[in-house]
């Protein structure tokens, strides 16, 4: 009998917590709510450079129900994408202790009539500890940070795109 009462109390407590969380507006990050006219998109990247952001952005767009294909109504053009690395701090022997990584992306969104509706420059930055004795580990960490920055930038682009008001015909 006591065991049944404990389970019932736990169920009531769990239900109350869920209600409180939903009442305050909390929700898990899920797919973006995209207006129907925005669900078709042409994605263009600079021809001369191999974009590291493009495959990440394409996967994210498609995962959120946006068909990425040539000739679609809206156009998202990555104008430029620049990665950089600089020394952030130096140690006592003038050795590099930290590097600062950054990725800067400039993009534009055009409506089906070719009118610009959104143009932004986004920046993602990370700093990491560098150890010259562990070069391979530092290189792997740098590569992982660039991947995280690409994901961050792709999410920002998606949020900005999802908040657009569709053009009225």
Label for each model-derived stretch:
Residues 32-33:
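Hydrophobic ligand-binding cavity/cleft-lining segments
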Residues 74-121, 127-143:
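Surface-exposed short loop/turn segments
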Residues 61-65, 109-113, 132, 156-165:
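Sec/Tat-exported extracytoplasmic proteins
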Residues 2-13:
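Bacterial N-terminal signal peptides that target proteins for export
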Residues 36-81:
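N-terminal segment of the mature soluble domain
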Residues 136-169:
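C-terminal/domain-edge helix-coil "capping" segments
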Residues 25-28:
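Bacterial signal peptide processing site
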Residues 20-23:
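C-terminal motif of bacterial Sec signal peptides marking the signal peptidase cleavage site
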């Amino acid at each position: 009998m006591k065991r049944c009462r404990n389970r019932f109390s736990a169920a009531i407590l769990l239900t109350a917590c869920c209600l409180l969380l939903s009442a305050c507006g909390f929700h898990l990050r899920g797919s973006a709510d995209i207006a129907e006219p925005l669900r078709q998109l042409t994605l263009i990247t600079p021809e001369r450079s191999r974009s590291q952001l493009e495959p990440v952005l394409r996967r994210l767009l498609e995962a959120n129900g946006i068909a990425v294909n040539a000739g679609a109504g809206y156009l998202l053009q990555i104008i430029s994408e620049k990665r950089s690395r600089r020394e952030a701090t130096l140690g006592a022997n003038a050795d590099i202790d930290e590097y600062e990584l950054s990725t800067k992306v400039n993009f534009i969104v055009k409506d089906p009539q070719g009118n610009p509706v959104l143009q932004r420059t986004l920046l993602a930055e990370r700093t990491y500890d560098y150890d010259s004795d562990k070069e391979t580990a530092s290189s792997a960490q740098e590569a992982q940070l660039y991947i995280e920055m690409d994901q961050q930038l792709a999410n920002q682009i998606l949020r900005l795109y999802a908040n657009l008001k569709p053009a009225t015909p």
